[in-house]
Amino acid sequence: MESLFIKLAKYPIIKTERLVLRPVTLDDAEAMFEYASDKENTRYTFPTNQSLEETKNNIAQFYLASPLGRWGIELKSTGEFIGTIDLHKLDAVLKKATIGYIINQKYWNQGLTTEANRAVIELAFEKIGMNKLDAFHDKDNPASGKVMEKSGMRFSHEELYARMDKNEPGRFVTDVHYVLTKEEYFANK
């Protein structure tokens, strides 16, 4: 039986109506740095990048060293790189993963993140054979929860004192968790 990783390797590119999800390369560094260096854009995701070199290093360590289940989000109409989406915490035995995403704030509120999320969810259940996907967001970032809801995920629970904020020293984060099982996905398709 084909492993989850072999199945993922077969889908380096996913196309949607307005997007191309494709491997991230060092050529994406400047476009990624545009949002990765913006404190408002990275507020709830990862530490704000301080230099283009830091962004290049992050691309090499995160996307190039381990590319399976990680895609850059590109606008089909212009070829512009606008964000990333990934399946992480992959568990090949239980066939579950966590979805994470970030998009340049110039493209917020246009349904693009939801479109990318739906495409990854469809791939995970229909092609890869996943059993469960989850996602979480900082309680102070309800817009991310709306993406999860619009993508078919359901609220699971709140986790108080889940972690320390990466951008605001001393702040405890409450994470809001969403989940979608294969049974729920196919029942609502």
Where are these regions (language model features)?
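Juxtamembrane/interface motifs at transmembrane-helix termini
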Residues: 51-54, 63-65, 76, 102-104
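Conserved GNAT-fold acetyl-CoA-binding loop/helix
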Residues: 40-61
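Generic hydrophobic, helix-prone segments enriched in Leu/Val/Ile
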Residues: 8-11, 49, 63
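Acyl-donor (CoA/ACP) binding surface of acyl/acetyltransferases
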Residues: 1-43, 70, 74-189
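A short helix-loop-beta-strand connector motif used in the catalytic cores of GNAT acetyltransferases and
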Residues: 60-72
